[in-house]
Each structure stands twice: as C-alpha cells, then as structure tokens.
Amino acid sequence: MAPNIRKSHPLLKIINSSLIDLPSPSNISAWWNFGSLLGICLITQILTGLLLAMHYTADTSLAFSSVAHTCRNVQYGWLIRNLHANGASFFFICIYLHIGRGFYYGSYLYKETWNTGVVLLLTLMATAFVGYVLPWGQMSFWGATVITNLFSAIPYIGQTLVEWAWGGFSVDNPTLTRFFALHFLLPFLIAGITLIHLTFLHETGSNNPLGIVSHSDKIPFHPYFSLKDALGFALMFIPLLTLAFFSPNLLGDPENFTPANPLVTPPHIKPEWYFLFAYAILRSIPNKLGGVLALAASVLILFLIPFLHKSKQRSMTFRPLSQILFWLLVANLLILTWIGSQPVEHPFIIIGQMASFSYFLILLVLFPAIGALENKMLY
C-alpha cells in the first residue's frame, strides 16, 4: 500500500498529528472551542495589524493624522481599523472565558500548559497596552503616562527604569516609536509561545468536562472538532463584524478622538474595558507601591492556582460548593470591572476595596478550604 503523504511527509505529519488525527476526548463541550477561537483572533489581529502598519506613521506629530488618513482615504481602511480595535476586545473575551474554563474544569493541573498560558496572557496584556498608545489620542497618551509611571514605585531603580522606558523625561516621540516596535514584535512572540502551549497540551491530551482520564474513548479531531471549531469561528465573527460595521466605537473612549495634549489631563483616565478589573485593584490600595504589587498579584496569582487545588476531584462538575465559589468569583470580577470605570469617590472606593479583598480571599483561602471540606464531606 502506498504511504499516506499526510502521515509520512516530515512537515505534514506534524500538522496531521496536531490538527487532523489528534485523539480528542469525545465529550468536550463548547467551552473547549475558545483555544481555536484565540488562534483565529491572533491570525486576524496579525493580518489587520500588518495592513494598518503599512499606513501608520510612528511619530508624535503624524500618528493621529495617519490613523485618521487610514480611516478616511485608504480602501476599506475604516473596516481594517475597526476590526483590529474590536478584535482586541474579542481576543480578551475569548482568553478570559478560556481561563475560566480551565479554572472550572481543573485544566490547570496540566501545569506546563497552564503556566505557558499565563505567560501568553501577560504578553497579550502588554501587546494590547502598547497598541492602545499608538493612535496618540488623549487616552493613549495619558494611559501610557499613568501605567508606565507605576514602575517608578519600584524601590531604588524605579525612576531610572521609567526614564529608560520612556526614552526621556516624559512620554514623547521616543516612547511612541518603541511602543510601535514592541506592538509589531509581540504578536509574533505570542504566536511562538502558542506553539509551545500546544506542544505541552499535546503531551497530555485535552482535559474534559468530567475531569477523568478519557484514553479509552477518544475520537479524531477531524472532522468532528474541526467542524465544531468552524461553527465557533462563524459564531465569533458574526458579533465581531456586527460591532465593526454598526457600532465600532462602542467599547472605545470618546477621549481618544482628541489628539494627545500633555497640557490637558482628561477628567477620568481609565484603560480599555478588559483591564478595568486590574485597574480597580490597583486603585483600591491608597499607596503607590502597594497598588502596583496588588495589580501584579491580581494576574500573577494564576501561577499559584495549581498549588491551591486541594480537592480529590479534578473538575468542579460534581462539586456544588466550589461551583458557588466560582460564580461568586465571576460576579466579583464583574463588580471590579464596573468599579474600574467609575470615578474615585464614595461609594465606589469602599466597594472596590471590598471586591479587591474578596478576589484574593476567594482564590487564596476559600477555594483550597472548600476543596478540602468537600473531600471531608464526600470521602
């Protein structure tokens, strides 16, 4: 019998074992679609970003105008920009749901896959931050100023570090130039780390909703999950295109329609919606260094999750107490997101502090405690 090129060709056999003949659990639900959705988000962002970069000028006197020019004079430039800006929002929606899925079903017990995933999240956050600065509107400029300034809270080296990052004594042309360079580079780094993420995942195979070993009941990825993923792509692109066509500025800040002006501070400096939860945690501590540490901890805490798993069951499917806690955490994050968008005044300050405290309490104390309690109740 002639050898199948799909299985014998040095390159094709890698693709085959990753995307075609990959043995997959037969019972994975739609929550397992977000990995491929993140992949398609990344590809979309790189393609639209590349097209935008062809018309963008990384100079403080020209950046704002070059973006306006892209939207007004370039064929479908408005669409490319709207897809890129709103594509970032969908990227974050997908990654947050993907992390939530991993948390709920105990996928974090694949430690290498989980840790590379957290690194991917951090890189994505860095990419989105530097990208938001590029249009050089008011919120771009002041967002860059406020967030980079946080590094000055680091003892001893802080101020030097910030001036080194800025390339001067304030956010200016050198800052914009390097942010553009970083925004161009980081997505390719994300693509590289994604391959590592997938390599680690394919070492163990996918987890499943029951959290049990599924070797005895695997099915090929293609056609079952390739088709299911294609449906997922369609279901994501429909709202993305709807947003890009009908309400492209819904998630943006009106302040960014004003060119950057170092002499005028906007009344409310706030990041894009996907960073608001972390911004609320940052603001909840009335001390610069403390706030920066809490901000870092709010994301880095994900590295600790595998060590805080005390339950004898992997998934939360059959753990009602942990489920209640999980949805409390989700509600808590929504409250933090809302607080991050509000001005720093009563009652938002105290609500933010309570939500920030309960965020860390739920993750560090209650989850392991409830996991241990459920063991006592069940076994």
Swiss-Prot record:
It is found in: Mitochondrion inner membrane. Binds 2 heme b groups non-covalently. A ubiquinone binds at residue 202. GO terms for molecular function: metal ion binding; ubiquinol-cytochrome-c reductase activity. Disulfide bonds: none annotated. It is a multi-pass membrane protein. InterPro entries: Cyt_b/b6_C, Cyt_b/b6_C_sf, Cyt_b/b6_N, Cytb/b6-like_sf, Cytochrome_b, Cytochrome_b_C_euk/bac, Cytochrome_b_N_euk/bac, Di-haem_cyt_TM. The keyword Transport applies. GO terms for biological process: mitochondrial electron transport, ubiquinol to cytochrome c. Its cofactor is heme b. GO terms for cellular component: mitochondrial inner membrane; respiratory chain complex III. Component of the ubiquinol-cytochrome c reductase complex (complex III or cytochrome b-c1 complex) that is part of the mitochondrial respiratory chain. The b-c1 complex mediates electron transfer from ubiquinol to cytochrome c. Contributes to the generation of a proton gradient across the mitochondrial membrane that is then used for ATP synthesis. Belongs to the cytochrome b family. Heme 1 (or BL or b562) is low-potential and absorbs at about 562 nm, and heme 2 (or BH or b566) is high-potential and absorbs at about 566 nm. This is Cytochrome b. The lineage of its organism: Eukaryota, Metazoa, Chordata, Craniata, Vertebrata. The gene is MT-CYB.
